[in-house]
Amino acid sequence: MRIALDAMGSDNAPSAEIEGIALALDELKDLEVVLVGKPGIVDSETMDGYSGRLELVPAAEVVGMNESPYEVVKRKRNSSMAVCMELLKQGKVSGVVSAGNTGAVMAFALTTLGVVPGVHRPALGALFPTIKGSTLVVDIGANVDTKPLQLLQFGIMGTTAASYLFKKANPSVGLLNIGHEDSKGNELTFNAYQLFKQSEMNFVGNVEGNAILKGTVDVVVCDGFVGNALLKYAEGLAEVLSGLLEQYLEPDSEHRTRRWRRWLSKPVLREFIERMDYQEHGGSLMLGVLGAVVVAHGRSTPRAIKNALRSAATAAQDNLSEHIRHRFAETAPTT
C-alpha cells in the first residue's frame, strides 16, 4: 500500500513526520510512503535504507496553521498538501495523511478529489476507545453548523465505514444528545431524530456522552462543534490520566503507598490509558470525499504519524470511499 505523507504539516514538521515514517516502515512491511515536502529534508542514507519503499516528492510551499483554507487553495497549488492530493487523484498513491491545517486539508480534498455524489458535506470520523473496543464518532470538527439531513448523512457515512472497520454487517448508530428520550435536545437533534428513525440504519435512538466510553453503539453522530469539544476533552483526559500515573509512581511521591503502587502498576490500567491516547489512533478519517484521506493532529508525535499512516492504509485497503459512494447511489437521501 502506497501512502502520501505531507512532510510539512505538523507543529514539529518535518522531524515528526520523518521519524514517524521510520516507525511505520519498520512495523508495516507492506507499506510504501511518498514523503512530500521541501527538497533535502531526508538524507540519502535514510532513503537507501528502505529499499525503494520511501520516495521524496518535492513541494516548495508550506501551508500554515493559521492560513485561510480558501486563500491557500487559490495561491498554494505547489504546497506539500496540494501535491499530496494531486498524487492521490492521479492514482500514484492510495491514500493521503496530513497533520496540517484541517480546513486547508478539507479544502484541497474537496477541490482536487471531489465529493461523493449526494453528500452535502464531508465529515471527520474519529475512533474513540471504549471498554468494548472502539466507537466511531462523526463529525469531530469539519462542520460546526449542520442541518438535520447532514447529521443523517454523517450517520450513513459512519455506519458504512464502521461495517468495514469493525467487520460488522449492521453496525449500530446513536444520535448524541442530553438524554435518551426522543423528546430531548434542541431543534437540530429533534428533527434529526425523526430522520434517523425513518432510515434503514440500525438506529438505537439518542445516546448520552457516557455511551461512547461504554461502547453502547458502534457509531455516534453529532455536529462538528460538539464533536470537536468531545475530542479535545478525551485527549485531555488521557493526558491527565497518564500524568497522574507517572506522578503517583515516582519513587518520592507522597501518594506512593504499596497499595497504590500495586494498583497503578497493573498492566490493564496502563493499557487503558494508552488506548485513550490520541497517538494510538493517529488521526481522523475524512468521510465523503473520493479518496482515503486522514487528518492527523497538529501536535502529532512520530507514534501518531505512524498510526495515521496505518489508518490511511486501512481505509484505502477497505476502499471506504467507494463503499460510501455505492451506499449513497443506492439508498441515501439527498434532499
What are these regions (language model features)?
Residues 6, 35-36, 57, 98-100, ...:
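Short beta-strand segments
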Residues 110-123, 127-137, 216-220, 224-335:
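Glycine-rich phosphate/nucleotide-binding loop
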Residues 1-5, 11-15, 29-32, 49, ...:
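N-terminal charge/polar-biased segments
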Residues 49-93:
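Phosphate/nucleotide-donor binding subsite
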Residues 13-67:
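N-terminal glycine-rich anion-binding loop in soluble enzyme alpha/beta folds
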